[in-house]
Amino acid sequence: MSYDYNSSDPIKIKLADLEARERFLLSESKTFCMYPWIHLHAYPTGEAYPCCLAEMEHPIGNMRDNSLEEIWNGSNYVQMRERMLADKPCKECTRCYEQEAQGFFSMRNSHNKHFGHHIDKVDQGVNPDFKIVYWDIRFSNLCNLKCRSCGDIFSSNWVQENK
C-alpha cells in the first residue's frame, strides 16, 4: 500500500454507520487505538513497537530475533490488542494516556480519527492474514543531519555530541 501525499483529508466514516462495538472503540474507549491492527514501528536496534511513541521499556518484539509475522502475531502484540478490546490500559501506551489526561489530543486519538476506516480489521488479537497497512522501520542510524528533534538512536551525527 502506498500513501497518497496529495490527499488533503483522511477517509471519512460516519459513526452512525458503524456497529455499536465499533462506534464504542473509535469514539468512547479510553484505551483503544487502531495502530496495533495496522501498524508496526521498529528502531535501528531491531526492537519493535506499536508506534513511535510507545514506551521503550516495553518492546513487542525484536526484528533481529523474529520475523515481522512472528512479531505481528506474537504473544506481546496479541495481548496488547486483547487488552485494548477489553478497554484496559496498555503499558506501551502510557504517553497517549498521559497526554489525554492533561486535555491534549493524543496520537491515539489521531490514529483513531485518521485510520478508523480500517475498523473492519479489528476482530481479535491475532491477524492470521498478516496484512500490515503502514509500517515505520528504521534500518540504521546513518544520517548526515543533526536535527534537534532527533538523537543518536536515529542519527549518527548525534553520537559524538552525546558521548
Locate the predicted segments by residue.
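Accessory C-terminal segments flanking Radical SAM cores
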Residues: 2-117, 131-134
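N-terminal pre-triad scaffold of radical SAM enzymes
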Residues: 37-46, 125-154
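Short, non-ligating residues that shape and space the ligands of small metal-coordination modules
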Residues: 102-103, 149, 156-157
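A Trp-anchored, charged/polar loop motif used as the substrate-binding/catalytic surface
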Residues: 117-126
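A solvent-exposed, charged loop/short amphipathic helix patch at secondary-structure junctions
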Residues: 157-163
